[in-house]
Amino acid sequence: MVQIIDGKALAQKMQAALAKKVESLKAEKGIVPGLVVILVGDNPASQVYVRNKERAALAAGFKSETVRLSDSVCQEELIELIEQYNQDDTIHGILVQLPLPHHINDKSIILAIDPKKDVDGFHPMNTGHLWSGRPNMVPCTPAGIMEMFHDYGIELEGKNAVIVGRSNIVGKPMAQLLLDKNATVTLTHSRTRQLAAICRRADILIVAIGQGHFITKDFVKEGAVVIDVGMNRDVNGRLIGDVAFDEVSELASMITPVPGGVGPMTITMLLEQTYQAALRRVSQ
């Protein structure tokens, strides 16, 4: 019988504990962790993500700001806004919601964020810390998945872990975090040959490609742990993952659902890293 990895329940537990830590920080040091989310344009999915982040931040006792900009905003204006928040001592975390309009260079925007406030973990300084085995700010989705492994007692050392998708947001940082735990990692992508055969060797299979129900039972060995990062809409508008949940559940020992799996943990780690940034500010 497959065990469902309930990311929603774990996120609720962690956010409740975080709210208590925030309350203590405010009482003892007079500091409230501050998070600003900058949204450019009117991408419907991004709007949903931003609302969820704002709601969770306020519920945990954070100072939360959301800046909504027209998709016609120029890159220089956006960088100027980021610089203002870099200098704002009441803001400990800055997140620019991706994707950005085509006329704005993502890399330039990420570089503009103070690495100490880069709670998405995308700044080259933070990726350098991650790849040198000294993680500081870590991309939130991989960080959330690692918390799931810990909470559910999933052993990583010596296990074969296969990641489908090599993005800077999930695939690459996920690979490094697993290597740090002594897993044997294979990072696959759209040019990988015999993908199904490689996936069938996985004790732990992590999928982040943005293609609904791409991973079927033909990709999964019996007893594997399957982590589905995908968020897609089917023809009826229903939210589905990259993994064909029903058929893969027949083989997997543990699996994350969509929705209610990885997504809530991503937001939780965003808040946790903002809190940690506020703590570091106190100790300076």
From Swiss-Prot:
Keyword annotations of the record: Amino-acid biosynthesis, Histidine biosynthesis, Hydrolase, Methionine biosynthesis, Multifunctional enzyme, NADP, One-carbon metabolism, Oxidoreductase, Purine biosynthesis
Binding site for NADP(+): G165, R166, S167, S190
One of the Pfam families matching this protein, by short name: THF_DHG_CYH_C
Catalyzed reaction equations: (6R)-5,10-methylene-5,6,7,8-tetrahydrofolate + NADP(+) = (6R)-5,10-methenyltetrahydrofolate + NADPH; (6R)-5,10-methenyltetrahydrofolate + H2O = (6R)-10-formyltetrahydrofolate + H(+)
Pathway, per record: One-carbon metabolism; tetrahydrofolate interconversion
An example molecular function term from Gene Ontology annotations: methenyltetrahydrofolate cyclohydrolase activity
InterPro entries: Aminoacid_DH-like_N_sf, NAD(P)-bd_dom_sf, THF_DH/CycHdrlase, THF_DH/CycHdrlase_cat_dom, THF_DH/CycHdrlase_CS, THF_DH/CycHdrlase_NAD-bd_dom
A GO term from the CC aspect: cytosol
One of the protein's GO biological processes: L-histidine biosynthetic process
EC number(s) recorded for this UniProt protein: 1.5.1.5, 3.5.4.9
Classification via CDD domains: NAD_bind_m-THF_DH_Cyclohyd
Sequence similarity: Belongs to the tetrahydrofolate dehydrogenase/cyclohydrolase family.
Summary of the function given for this chain in its UniProt record: Catalyzes the oxidation of 5,10-methylenetetrahydrofolate to 5,10-methenyltetrahydrofolate and then the hydrolysis of 5,10-methenyltetrahydrofolate to 10-formyltetrahydrofolate.
Subunit architecture: Homodimer.
Listed NCBIfam families: PRK10792.1 (NF008058), PRK14179.1 (NF010776), PRK14186.1 (NF010783), PRK14188.1 (NF010785)
Protein name per its UniProtKB record: Bifunctional protein FolD
